[in-house]
Every structure is written in C-alpha cells, then in structure tokens.
Amino acid sequence: MINSFESQKVDNDYKIAAFYSFSPIAEKVITTFLSKLRIIAEKHNVRGTVLVALEGINGTICGPVEGVTAMQKQLDSLDLETPLEIKYSYTSRQAFRRFKARRKNEIVTMGVENVDPCKTTGKYVEPEDWNAFLDDPLTLVIDTRNEYEISVGSFDGAVNPRTDSFREFPEWVDKKLHSLLKKKSFKKIALFCTGGIRCEKASALLLREGFPEVHHLHGGILRYLEEVPENESRWNGECFVFDQRVALNHKLMPGVYKLCFACGMPLSPQDQNGKYYIPSIQCHHCVDLFSDDDRERFRERQRHIARLGERFPGNSIWPSA
C-alpha cells in the first residue's frame, strides 16, 4: 500500500521514501539491480540506503521528486510477490549524506536462523484499529525498537524490552516474554516499530517460538501518525527516525529533538540546555566517554562541515547538533 504526505510539499523540495517488502529475491538479479540503483542515484542526486537480501528489500531514500520517482520505477522492476510498503514525507533539505546500496544477509538484522517473514508473519492491525489493542487488557503491547528510540516517544502502556539493537530482541523473548504473559494471562501479543519492518520480522520469530496470537501494526508508527487524527492519537512524544531529521512530530515534520554527533544519542530540548551539552562535541550521555583529544577532533570535524555548508548551502542538514 502506498501512503502519501502530499500536504507537506509546500516549501519542501526533497521527497523522502521509506519502504520495505519481505518477498523472495533471486540471487542472480541482486548485483545488477543494485548497480542500476547507484546509477539512478548519481544521476538524480538521490541519497540514503537500500538493502537487498534473499528475503526482500528495505530502504530509505531522499532526493528531488523526479529522482525518487525514477528510483521507485527501478524498485517496481523487481516485481515483488508482496508489494512494497512505502511511506512518503518531505523536507526542505537533503536528509542523508551519501547513497548506499548493499547486498545483505538480512534486510533487518535479527541474527536468528529459520525465521522467514516471506512465509509466516503475524496478523496486521490497521492504524484505525490500533487503539482498541492498546485498550484491551488481554493484549500485551510490545515496542520492538531500541531503548534510545523509545526514550523519544512511544505508546502508553507498551512494554519496553530495553534493547540496544534488534539483535538483542530474540534473547529478550527467550528470557522475559513467557513470564510477562503469565503474569496477567495475556491472550494476544501486539507488536509495533517505526515503519513496520522490525515488528513484522519479530512476529515471525514469535510464531516460530510457539506464541499463537501475534499481531503487528501495519505500516508502523509512521503510518499510525499519518492516518489517525491527533485528537484520537495515543502516541506520546516524537518518533525517532534514522536520518538527519532525528525525530518527527505527529504532523510527520521534524520535531524538537537533535542528535549528539559525538555519541549519536537523541537529545530533548532539556538535554540541549543541560550543562554538559556542547553542540557537535558532547552531551550528558557521553561527557565521560571521550578525551580532550577526541573533543578537539570533533571540533575540527565541525569546522570542516561548516566550510562544506558554505560551499554547498542547503544541500544537507548534517549535522544538527
């Protein structure tokens, strides 16, 4: 299903497309396909990342509208069994520094064998039905994202597995999930993530582990924010995204969070006003992690980026903090 944020186009010259599909892709077509993507990206000033594996494709790209359209035509040439889940948004500046197109073992890395979302996944929950799952006392709602993402925003009552990477999620399932289900006799599990890809793969894992009633939010948080009116929304905070917008508000526009470019952690306005925060140099998360020599390197990096910004104004929003 294609979702469009056409209302954001005013005064925003760059289009962002986030997409994925769990569909089998033949090894013989991957190398040629990636080469064609690189050619299109170079021609049309499209940046971002596209990952392709035997299990499917996953990516986020940003560029002029005509460039993103050209890329999508190439994506469509794969003729996937499961259509791409695509979400669009707009920004006033380029959201990525470069373009990468790579062949990977997994399009989202879980690191567990015999989990195949091409064959088996949980049941989709459409955004308009999600609030009912949040309210259901017999449904355990789980945020499959990482701790630093959840710190920016989440749904009230959702379980936080406190993982630092998606690779840690299977271990959390093995050690914690059974006991959580027994505590309140939950009958269903409902998973969610940013755009749908991690919770879809997580649902395949849970089904393999024998959990019977597994659901996941179709299109993830981003589609929920797009389709559910703000006055009906149960979302709190902002949604962390893996590009230089850092986090999006309910209108799917860049919010108030910035990124510490020393350690990569998201920073709230309160964090940005903290005594340890120096833009692009350090924050309260990393003040004790780096030496004075490190900080001097960060300052030199920032001076270099500033010079590039003077040469190429408006071409990138890196860095923001």
Curated annotation (Swiss-Prot):
Function (record text): Catalyzes oxygen-dependent 5-hydroxyuridine (ho5U) modification at position 34 in tRNAs.
Protein biosynthesis found in the keyword field: no
Name assigned to this protein: tRNA uridine(34) hydroxylase
Assigned keywords, A-Z: Oxidoreductase, tRNA processing
Organism per entry: Prochlorococcus marinus (strain SARG / CCMP1375 / SS120)
Pfam families, sorted: Rhodanese (PF00581), UPF0176_N (PF17773)
Gene expressing this chain: trhO
Residue positions of the active site: 193 (cysteine persulfide intermediate)
Entry-linked NCBIfam families: PRK00142.1-4
HAMAP family: TrhO
One MF annotation (Gene Ontology) recorded for this entry: oxidoreductase activity, acting on paired donors, with incorporation or reduction of molecular oxygen
Matching InterPro entries: Rhodanese-like_dom, Rhodanese-like_dom_sf, TrhO, TRHO_N
